[in-house]
Amino acid sequence: MSSLVADTLEEYGSSTREAMAGYLPNGYPARHLYEPLADYPRRAGKMMRPSICIATARAFGASQADAIRSAAAIELLHNAMLVHDDIQDGSELRRGRPTLHMLHGVPLAINAGDALFLLSLRPLFDNVGIFGSLLGLRILREMEQVAWHSLEGQAIELGWIRENILDLEDADYLNMVLRKTCWLATALDLEPFIRFGFYLGAAFQIQDDLLNLAPDPRYGKEMNGDLLEGKRSLLLIHAYRHASRAERDRLSRLFRRQREQRNEEDVAFVLSLIAERGSIDYVRQFAHALAGAALHQSASIYGGLPPSRDREFIHGLASWIFNR
């Protein structure tokens, strides 16, 4: 099953990158706009969002050609948000290479991110021309909701960091992830799909938090980058909740400082606290429970459809999260 998922992600990801390439402009100013904005879309990401888009369309009887523009729009929007997120978080690596602002500076990276936001609209406008105004505009409205809710999720997380809020509940984290990972978005009656996406997206994010503690070089992640950035992961929330008063005070002082003022000793303290308080096991079990809920929801949505590779791909995502 993991091979099927990996192969499908590669196939649909390749198709999406090809579709995105058709929307990437060139010309003047190439060096300061068009080359930077094309950087992230050309890097090899996981491509889970566009692949789910294509597989779902095919599982319900549509063609890949019907879904490819929406898949390209989803990935272009995702890359636009990554550019801005990396600046806001002070991240140094993205997909194994320096982040855009590390390569080109913050002003040019912001401009490239803005351009990617605008570029993500072009495939959606093409949908209107191909599907007609009724369906095309519905898809466009869905994407607008995706963007708004993702921005809300980012604002929630940035607010926690700015105000140095550490005393959070699991529900606070899930609410942020629900918005930030774009799964809440819908103006239509798509509740089963929302639940599936939320469970899968939250499990994926939590597993990413775990991978960040000891990243495989293949994933291009910065070692302990989330801790250096002060991200309120479920790991940190759980460790803080079970810490002593003295440990809480130290965490508060640590995360009140700017990223560049945090050092290896600070990271070692947080890692030790996470290990001693059983946060890794707790979070791992939490992620598996969410993945199980995603699998159950997937069966209710896709189980009645004719057997197909796309249906099996969707079912296989819940276990693939932990085997990638």
Predicted regions located by residue number:
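All-alpha prenyltransferase/terpene-synthase fold signal
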Residues: 1-324
